[in-house]
């Protein structure tokens, strides 16, 4: 069968193992061809090709529901569910999304982008199914890294308490998340991975017992108990945790053997109640470079398929904000042993891998456990440690209660560095960092700031670490502005003090963080129309520099705020609220992300669609204030 001609995943039914293996080769070929050209997640999807094929040929996907955790490993799922011919548009504007979206396909039953949600969603569907008296299978596919997340463990705890609710959890164990997973549970899974497989006593034996004259039915329950005891005695450690939590455990199964996977899934479907099938896979399977470097090939920009090397940018770029942060933190840690960097399974993305390599004693990876990371940092701060929690803006949302309850209310000196703040591009709405300005500015005792460039980032990092209270700074994805960097001798900024960059009498433009340089470029465009602007780098949103901003607003009389975040409760709202509270009534234009989701596209395309380019912002300003 040609994969390009597959119109429905149910067409896998009845194919011979050799034919299914050929489909697997075609999936890998298409997967590699597209990702090498346009970029995307590589290793996760390559590792679940056989798992996906085997699972889908045991299901009726017109009715059965499969929930993929995170979604970055679901490229084979997309190729099997009608998106083969559009797959060239992967992660491109108006193309196939890099994650799962309910609006994209009827086979995407639950959207995702963050980890550890699949078991909860699948269990919810299973409970709804049973309440409605319907009959279909609910399956969650979750990676071993995501299983360290508290939400996944909460769902397992609940599901195990529902012995009459059929639910299949497929544990895709590739011994990795993005980087190697950490923690006792990961160690346990690794030990299980190398243990002999545990399967069921065959259906025929159970049927024979049931058919014994006079007593077959009577000893059915005792037989089930005996079966479990025999399995535990045979291999006492394998699956014991899941069995004790109420799951029937099967595995570990070779995740690249379609025949064995098919037999196991068929057996699992016959069990009533929650079942855990443990599948051992290899991340990056089938592409030697990805198998050899599973961290580096988790996700890739465009690369040469023959050599495995990334295709370099045509124009050299300054270091990224993330890299500057990581390098600066290493230097600060060298000077102060009390500083500790904390990540939640995102060492490479946040550049804390630099600290991990340089000073491992001052580095902590808690796994996919953002809530724990925040409160862990709070506990450290209580004892005189200076924790720096580096985390994506979108992932810090998962620990909002901890920010308020454990850090803010207690006024604990913890530094939060929010990476990927603002528009992130091809990862789409689940990963846009558009909400942190709003959700941080209302938390008691927090000081919140954003640098205009990488040099100011260095100063703000020192400011946060030296501050005797909770603080947060946001940095955008991508390269910096090329500002000169200092190797040492950084000084703290005055908290709550803005910076006036340009003086003009016709318009006041206040930029926050990554929008400061676009504000300067917008002012230059307006100058061509005779509009002279004062441009202020706000630096801080909490506390806001009311003295500087109020004086300029009253003097000039026309105000524009610019931010790379949602307008609802954002930086512009903070400025307008401050004006209102102080009886300053001046016309104000707030520019930022409107009340809408930002879909996957390049960052530049997203900014164009939102009206956030200097040219488009200049047009908005001219229309608002009648600058002709």
Curated annotation (Swiss-Prot):
Protein residues bound to Mg(2+): 144, 174
Cofactor remark from the record: Binds 1 Mg(2+) ion per subunit. Binds 1 thiamine pyrophosphate per subunit.
Catalysed reactions, semicolon-separated: D-glyceraldehyde 3-phosphate + pyruvate + H(+) = 1-deoxy-D-xylulose 5-phosphate + CO2
Coiled-coil intervals, chain numbering: none
E.C. code: 2.2.1.7
InterPro entries membership: Dxylulose-5-P_synthase, THDP-binding, Transketo_C/PFOR_II, Transketolase-like_Pyr-bd, Transketolase_BS, Transketolase_C, Transketolase_CS
Entry cofactors: Mg(2+); thiamine diphosphate
Annotated pathway: Metabolic intermediate biosynthesis; 1-deoxy-D-xylulose 5-phosphate biosynthesis; 1-deoxy-D-xylulose 5-phosphate from D-glyceraldehyde 3-phosphate and pyruvate: step 1/1
CC per GO annotation: cytosol
Binding locations of thiamine diphosphate: 72, 113-115, 145-146, 174, 287, 370
Keywords, sorted A to Z: Isoprene biosynthesis, Magnesium, Metal-binding, Thiamine biosynthesis, Thiamine pyrophosphate, Transferase
GO-annotated molecular function: 1-deoxy-D-xylulose-5-phosphate synthase activity; magnesium ion binding; thiamine pyrophosphate binding
Subunit structure: Homodimer.
PANTHER family, alphabetized: 1-D-DEOXYXYLULOSE 5-PHOSPHATE SYNTHASE-RELATED (PTHR43322), 1-DEOXY-D-XYLULOSE-5-PHOSPHATE SYNTHASE, CHLOROPLASTIC (PTHR43322:SF5)
HAMAP family reported for this sequence: DXP_synth
NCBIfam families (alphabetical): dxs (TIGR00204), PRK05444.2-2 (NF003933)
Family classification: Belongs to the transketolase family. DXPS subfamily.
Function (record text): Catalyzes the acyloin condensation reaction between C atoms 2 and 3 of pyruvate and glyceraldehyde 3-phosphate to yield 1-deoxy-D-xylulose-5-phosphate (DXP).
Name this protein carries in UniProt: 1-deoxy-D-xylulose-5-phosphate synthase
Record organism: Prochlorococcus marinus (strain NATL2A)
Lineage: Bacteria, Bacillati, Cyanobacteriota, Cyanophyceae, Synechococcales
């Amino acid at each position: 069968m040609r994969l390009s001609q597959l119109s429905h995943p149910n067409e896998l039914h009845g194919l011979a193992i050799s034919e299914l293996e050929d489909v697997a080769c075609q999936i890998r070929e298409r997967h590699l061809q597209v990702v090498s050209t346009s970029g995307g997640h590589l290793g996760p999807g390559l590792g679940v090709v056989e798992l996906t094929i085997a699972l889908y040929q045991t299901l009726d996907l017109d009715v059965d529901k499969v929930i993929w955790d995170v979604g970055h490993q679901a490229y084979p799922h997309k190729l099997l569910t009608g998106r083969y011919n559009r797959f060239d548009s992967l992660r491109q504007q108006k193309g196939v999304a890099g994650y799962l979206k309910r609006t994209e396909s009827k086979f995407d039953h639950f959207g995702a982008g963050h980890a550890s949600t699949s078991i909860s969603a699948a269990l919810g569907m299973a409970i709804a199914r049973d309440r409605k008296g319907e009959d279909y299978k609910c399956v969650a596919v979750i990676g071993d890294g995501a299983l360290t997340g508290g939400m996944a463990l909460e769902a397992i705890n609940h599901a195990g308490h529902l012995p009459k609710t059929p639910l299949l959890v497929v544990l895709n164990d590739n011994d990795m998340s993005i980087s190697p997973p950490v923690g006792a549970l990961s160690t346990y899974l690794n030990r299980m991975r190398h243990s002999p497989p545990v399967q069921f006593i065959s259906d025929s034996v159970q049927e024979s017992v049931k058919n014994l004259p006079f007593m077959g039915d009577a000893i059915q329950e005792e037989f089930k108990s005996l079966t479990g005891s025999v399995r535990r005695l045979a291999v006492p450690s394998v699956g014991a945790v899941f069995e004790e939590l109420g799951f029937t455990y099967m595995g570990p199964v070779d995740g690249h053997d379609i025949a064995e996977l098919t037999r196991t899934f068929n057996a699992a479907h016959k069990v009533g109640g929650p079942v855990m099938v443990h599948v051992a896979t290899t991340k990056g399977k089938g592409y030697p470079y990805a198998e050899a470097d599973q961290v580096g090939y988790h996700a890739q920009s465009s690369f040469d398929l023959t050599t495995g090397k990334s295709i370099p940018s045509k124009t050299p770029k300054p270091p990224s904000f993330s890299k500057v942060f990581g390098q600066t933190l290493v230097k600060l840690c060298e000077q102060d042993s009390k500083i500790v960097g904390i990540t939640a399974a995102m060492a490479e993305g946040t550049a804390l891998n630099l600290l991990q390599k340089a000073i491992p004693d001052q580095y902590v990876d808690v796994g996919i456990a953002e809530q724990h990371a925040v409160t862990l940092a709070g506990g450290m701060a209580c004892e005189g440690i200076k924790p720096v929690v580096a985390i994506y803006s979108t992932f810090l949302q998962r620990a909002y209660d901890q920010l308020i309850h454990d850090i803010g209310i207690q006024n604990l000196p913890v530094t939060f560095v929010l990476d990927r703040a603002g528009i992130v591009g091809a990862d789409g709405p689940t990963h846009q960092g558009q909400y942190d300005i709003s959700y941080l500015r209302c938390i008691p005792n927090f000081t919140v700031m954003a640098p205009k460039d990488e040099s100011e980032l260095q100063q703000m990092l020192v400011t946060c670490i030296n501050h005797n209270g909770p603080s947060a700074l946001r940095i955008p994805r991508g390269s910096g502005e090329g500002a000169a960097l200092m190797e040492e001798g950084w000084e703290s900024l005055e908290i709550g003090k803005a910076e006036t960059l340009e003086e003009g009498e016709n318009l006041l433009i206040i930029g926050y963080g990554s929008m400061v340089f676009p504000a300067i470029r917008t002012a230059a465009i307006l100058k061509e129309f005779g509009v002279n602007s004062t441009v202020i780098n706000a630096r801080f949103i909490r506390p806001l520099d009311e003295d500087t901003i109020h004086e300029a607003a009253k003097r000039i009389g026309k105000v524009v705020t610019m931010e790379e975040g949602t307008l609802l409760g954002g930086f512009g709202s903070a400025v307008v609220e401050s004006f209102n509270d102080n009886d300053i009534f001046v016309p104000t234009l707030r520019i930022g992300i409107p009340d809408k989701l930002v879909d996957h596209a390049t960052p530049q395309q997203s900014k164009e669609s939102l009206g956030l380019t200097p040219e488009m912002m200049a047009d908005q300003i001219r229309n608002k204030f009648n600058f002709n």
